[in-house]
Amino acid sequence: MGEEGIKINDTHKRRIDEVEPSEKEDNVERQTKKYNFEIDEPEEQEKKDEKEDDKEESPSKSLEEISQSVSPVEEEPRDVRFKELSTPFSYPINDPPEGRPVRVYADGVFDLFHIGHMRQLEQAKKVFPNVHLIVGLPNDQLTHRLKGLTVMNDKERAEALRHCKWVDEVLENAPWVITPEFLEEHKIDFVAHDDIPYASDDSGDIYLPVKKVGKFIPTKRTEGVSTSDLITRIIRDYDQYVMRNLARGVNRKELNVSLFKKNELDLRHHIKVLRDTLRNHWVSTTRDLKADIKSFLSMATTDYQLQKNPLHGSSEPSSPGPTGFLGGINRWMQRRSSSHYDLPRVGNEIAASSSSATEENH
């Protein structure tokens, strides 16, 4: 650059009115060629200024809208993948390490392991291309003290997690609050959990220290599915489940049901069975009655057609009688009528035969 750079600097230090027009044009042309600047025409510059004014007047998005529109995972858990964050969250997110699997840690109680848990673990597994997913599980003593009673014990919950295909490692007796020492001990690169602040006795958000050091990856919750929701469904239909288990032979003491409650549920169960039986029999009886009426009407129509147009060589139409209830009544009536008219004829035949036998003897 040398002398030319010095000349340019000297020119810039001089007042504009002291520089000749030709000299100004030479300077501008020289700087344009050197730095490849694009000089806009006055009209184009005015258009750019108008666009910038429009951008300034347009309402800016709130931080909440920005955080919702930009997430490190996609909406659908099947296509979860890491995305570059053009707009950061309220906390930083570090770049993943290269040349080795990324060790991601996800913790929780995971009681009554359900689809919401599975989708959370799937997001954690797919947040980077190569992830080793570690799942932390607090023991029963810690969980019952800080969160409440669980349906499954810690061994059952750990075994359920081991059968999930997204999980590479289950860490039992995990701490309730993640500390830097814990991250260092297990060489954890990131912690994956939903972004809702999880309060404890000592902190408003137990994941806040992890967020501050850039090791927190937010996942999305599955709405409408939770362990509390499953328990609510069971409690809502409590009597039905108890009656079902009692009918299957489960002891009432195992169900924590008193003798009075058991007798009440037994009575309700018997009433329900009786009602269902009557309903089912009524349905079957109605179905048979409809079939008999249909058969009777079709037989009557056939008889009428045969009487109107008899077949050659047949004096009476042959048709199968009705079946079912009406068929039985019809056959019974036919037997009664035939026996009523046949008895005198049979008696006359017996009397005639006896008289002829007497005449022969004489």
Curated annotation (Swiss-Prot):
Reaction it catalyzes: phosphocholine + CTP + H(+) = CDP-choline + diphosphate
Biased composition (Low complexity): 313-323, 351-362
Record-listed substrate binding positions: 147, 176
Matching InterPro entries: CCT, Cyt_trans-like, Pcy1-like, Rossmann-like_a/b/a_fold
Pfam families: CTP_transf_like
Basic and acidic residues composition-biased segments: 1-37
Keyword Iron tagged: no
Residues with the Phosphoserine modification: 315, 319, 355
SUPFAM superfamilies documented for this protein: Nucleotidylyl transferase
Database matches in Gene3D superfamilies: HUPs
Superkingdom per UniProt: Eukaryota
Alphabetized GO MF terms: choline-phosphate cytidylyltransferase activity; phosphatidylcholine binding
Chain residues that bind CTP: 109-117, 147, 193-194, 198, 221-225
UniProt-annotated stretches for the region Disordered: 1-79, 308-362
Family: Belongs to the cytidylyltransferase family.
Protein's UniProt name: Probable choline-phosphate cytidylyltransferase
